[in-house]
Amino acid sequence: MKSQWSNFHQIGRNSFLAASTVYVSNEFNFLNTSLLNRRSFCFAEGDRSSFVVLKSEAEFNSALSKARDGSLPSVFYFTAAWCGPCRLISPVILELSNKYPDVTTYKVDIDEGGLSNAIGKLNVSAVPTLQFFKGGVKKAEIVGVDVVRLKSVMEQLYK
């Protein structure tokens, strides 16, 4: 069967569109078990991850205080339920939170009630946005989906 994306070669290989475009077949293969081997978004028992979902401004302020006083290396992941790119990068962030268990990753849903002031405190204007803190200082920021840069920043700052 020929792909319906005949002009796909005109899109840059490293562009977001190329990375997020998925060919959909007219047939479904029930024998395809690749999804069975994928990691669940739920944390398994014994998971070493340090992934925290912030639900209130008080929780956000506490996390930001820990990040700014230097006591806790942190990543703030600003996201939204409606954000397609956020859904693409979420599994990578979960994987990295397991790889670097001493770094706390805080997930902040920008549409969560009471967190609108949090967005202003760190000057977040788009999602996904990741801000990296080490030694009490914001060391890096990534806006958008850049998996290679995300892995590189994590390795440089927290290894």
From Swiss-Prot:
Active-site residue list: C83 (nucleophile), C86 (nucleophile)
GO molecular function ontology, one term from the record: oxidoreductase activity, acting on a sulfur group of donors, disulfide as acceptor
Annotated site residue numbers, Contributes to redox potential value: G84, P85
CDD domains listed in its UniProt record: TRX_family (cd02947)
Annotated compartments: Mitochondrion
Disulfide bonds: C83-C86
Residue span, Thioredoxin domain: 43-159
Homology family: Belongs to the thioredoxin family. Plant O-type subfamily.
Key words of the record: Disulfide bond, Electron transport, Mitochondrion, Phosphoprotein, Redox-active center, Transit peptide, Transport
Function: Thiol-disulfide oxidoreductase that may participate in various redox reactions. Possesses insulin disulfide bonds reducing activity. Reduced by thioredoxin reductases NTRA and NTRB.
Pfam families: Thioredoxin (PF00085)
Modified residues (Phosphoserine): S40
Name this protein carries in UniProt: Thioredoxin O2, mitochondrial
